[in-house]
Amino acid sequence: MEYQFTHSIHGVVAKCSMDHEAFARWLNTEITENPKELINIFAEIEKCRAAYPNHYECVFEGKEYSLFLDCDEVMVKANNLDDAFDESQMEDGFQFYDQESIAFCGLEDFENFLKAYQKFSKTYH
C-alpha cells in the first residue's frame, strides 16, 4: 500500500495508490474531522492481534465511509455502495466505477498507514 501526505490550508490530505484510494478518502472525510477516533481504532487493532488465531472483527461506521477490521484484513467501504443499483439501466459498454468506494489491505499495512498519518500530522500541522 503506497500513500502520500500533503499539507494544505485545509489541513493534512492523504493520497493512496490506485487500489487503495478508498483508504485516503476515508481518512480525509472521517478522521480529519475527528482525529481522536484513531485512539479507538488503534485499540481495536490491538484487540484483533490479541484474539488471533480466533476470529475478531470490529466496525467503525462513519458518515460517508465505514471501516471493517478483523485479524487478517481491513476494508474501507463507502456507505452508499450498498444502495440499490440497477445495472440494466446503464448504457452498453459502461461499468459502475467503484475504485474509490472500496479497498482492502492487511492489518499491519493499515496500522503503518495510520501511524505515518499521525506522525505527519504532528510534524506539519
Swiss-Prot record:
InterPro entries assigned to the protein according to its UniProt record, in alphabetical order: UPF0231 (IPR008249)
Disulfide pairings: none
Pfam families in the cross-refs: UPF0231
Family per similarity comment: Belongs to the UPF0231 family.
Listed HAMAP family: UPF0231 (MF_01053)
Name assigned to this protein: UPF0231 protein APJL_0987
